[in-house]
């Protein structure tokens, strides 16, 4: 509801349709992406086009209009199955799925652009984001959404494994 923030629903794969939105801005908070593991296995080209080519289009739009700051919503999935918890940013990058690969390559692309075009960036490798609009239709990643759906339909919670697994969660407001 802030008057300082404007939301535009555009396709980041189309440079011509997005580039003029970057005129006169100070900072890009890049949240646009396809996100989900299973569909990325079924349609990897869609994920690569949106998450990599789309990110290049965001960066090119920034370059055209001399925008020098970007916050990128990356993904903890770039670590694959981490060797230790908690997982910090120095852990080995080992993406296991096209989604994870595409988000990590987006992060690398921003780092590369930052060197060439003197852009300041922060990349947030988010773990299991949840909130009021959490998806309830997938078993992977969106555990809280699945649990909410089970609760609202009076079904028991489904635990896969021995119940001792640990996951990090972050609320969308954080």
Spans of features found by a protein language model:
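NAD(P)-dependent short-chain dehydrogenase/reductase
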Residues: 85, 108-168, 172-174
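N-terminal Rossmann-like NAD(P)+-binding domain of SDR-like oxidoreductases, especially those catalyzing
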Residues: 1-129, 173
């Amino acid at each position: 509801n802030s008057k300082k923030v404007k939301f535009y629903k555009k396709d980041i794969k189309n440079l011509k349709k997005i580039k003029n939105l970057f005129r006169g801005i100070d900072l890009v908070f890049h949240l646009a992406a396809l996100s989900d593991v299973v569909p990325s296995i079924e349609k990897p080209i869609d994920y690569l086009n949106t998450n990599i080519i789309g990110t290049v289009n965001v960066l090119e739009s920034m370059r055209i209009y001399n925008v020098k700051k970007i916050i990128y919503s990356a993904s903890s999935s770039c670590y694959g199955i981490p060797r230790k918890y908690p997982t910090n940013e120095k852990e080995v990058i080992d993406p296991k799925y096209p989604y994870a690969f595409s988000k990590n390559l987006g992060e690398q692309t921003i780092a590369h652009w930052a060197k060439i075009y003197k852009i300041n960036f922060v990349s947030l490798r988010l773990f299991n984001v949840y909130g009021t609009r959490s998806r309830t239709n997938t078993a992977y990643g969106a555990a809280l959404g699945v649990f909410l759906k089970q609760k609202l339909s009076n079904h028991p919670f489904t635990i896969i494994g021995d119940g001792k697994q640990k996951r990090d969660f972050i609320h969308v407001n954080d």
